[in-house]
Design a protein with these regions (language model features):
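Gly/Ala-rich phosphate-binding loop of Rossmann-like dinucleotide-binding domains
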Residues: 49, 154, 263
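Glycine- and other small-residue-rich loops at beta-strand/loop junctions that grip anionic moieties
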Residues: 59, 84, 137-139, 162-163
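Short glycine/proline- and charge-enriched loop/turn segments
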Residues: 22-30, 185-187, 236-238
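Structural motif
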Residues: 4, 133-134, 183
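Glycine-rich phosphate/adenosyl-contacting loop at the front of the ribokinase-like
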Residues: 1-60, 65-76, 245
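Conserved phosphate-binding/catalytic region of the ribokinase-like
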Residues: 1, 6, 29, 202-307
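Conserved phosphate/ATP/ADP-binding segment of small-molecule kinases
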Residues: 154-159, 164-234
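Conserved N-terminal subdomain of the carbohydrate kinase-like
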Residues: 24-30, 50-133, 299-307
Length: 307
């Protein structure tokens, strides 16, 4: 468990609104609200810290109370922010509206990370970045910045994972040189955006990414489970049927669980099972982070699911 992980991307304050009934558009809908630290990369970071992974974060925070709350929370969780930037700006915010079944209806994101996590900024941190074994980046950053991280990771043989975040943001990867990227984790809609080819055949879309130099594509398929594609191997994993409380952060949790398994020396299937297990736990709660999680609990959840 000695490998270290560096995550680079957006940190936000999440405001989630859970509508009491099926949403009526163009009207006011009664709802309950929860507030927490969010952003794809921060959800991943928080779960890795709970699983006792040596994890650090490069992100952009504002000069406000939200930033102080985030900094203090992460410091108490053992998450290093030493190379992050604090700007004279407002900390980013993610607002989502969820239907009564817990599924996302619509969301909006105000994010300062592309403005402040730039190539010159990261160039000044290059010696720090290359000290980590695994680098995880989200697509909230500018496409040129993402390309710089890909190139740095390739030249220093670092294991780079890209989390696509959303369809519009995943499209930033469509014209990038992905050679050397270890893994990308899209859902089916994000896969279409990344592949940027005319065909809509899943096999051809996956093949196009493999030919562009990606080693693994972990395709998330919702209630159908997920499939890990490699050049000479295909690993498929189903998921049990559960009642969803909140779908926010499930994919982030899955990646954190997979990274934990990978660092813990598990094979691909077991790492995927750990990812699914953590995602299923997150689907059962309001919010994107299961704060009671630890490595022993995660292995027990996996065991229970497989029984």
């Amino acid at each position: 468990m000695s490998k270290s992980v560096l995550c680079i991307g957006a940190t936000l304050i999440d405001e989630l609104y859970f509508c009491e009934n099926t949403i009526v558009t163009h009207s006011s809908n009664p709802a309950e609200k929860t507030t927490s630290i969010g952003g794809v990369i921060s959800n991943i970071v928080q779960h890795l810290a709970l699983l006792d992974i040596n994890v650090s974060l490069i992100t952009a925070l504002g000069s406000d109370g939200d930033a102080s709350f985030i900094s203090n929370t992460f410091k108490n969780s053992g998450i290093s922010l030493q190379e992050s930037t604090v700007a004279d700006d407002s900390t980013g915010k993610y607002i989502s509206i969820l239907n009564s079944d817990g599924n996302l209806f619509v969301s909006a994101c105000q994010d300062i990370s592309p403005k402040y996590i730039t190539i010159p900024f990261l160039e000044s941190k290059a010696d720090y970045i290359i000290n980590f074994d695994i680098i995880v980046v989200d697509t909230n950053l500018d496409s040129k910045t993402i390309q710089w991280i890909i190139d740095l990771s390739r030249s220093h043989q670092k294991l780079l994972i890209i989390e696509p975040v959303s369809v519009p943001k995943a499209s930033k990867l469509s014209n990038l040189n992905l050679d050397g990227v270890y893994m990308i984790t899209p859902n089916e809609e994000e896969l279409l955006a990344i592949a940027s080819i005319e065909t809509q055949t899943e096999k051809e879309l996956i093949q196009s990414l493999l030919e562009r130099g990606v080693t693994k594509i972990w395709l998330r398929k919702g209630h159908q489970g997920s499939v890990l594609h490699e050049r000479n191997q295909l690993t498929t994993l189903s998921v049990p049927s559960i009642t969803i409380v909140d779908s926010t952060g499930a994919g982030d949790a899955a990646l954190a669980g997979w990274i934990f398994g990978h660092i813990d020396g598990e094979d691909e299937l077991t790492s995927m099972q750990l990812g699914h297990s953590l995602a299923l736990e997150v689907l059962k709660i309001k919010g994107a982070v299961e704060s009671s999680m630890n490595r022993e609990k995660l292995y027990q959840v996996k065991k229970n699911i497989l029984q």
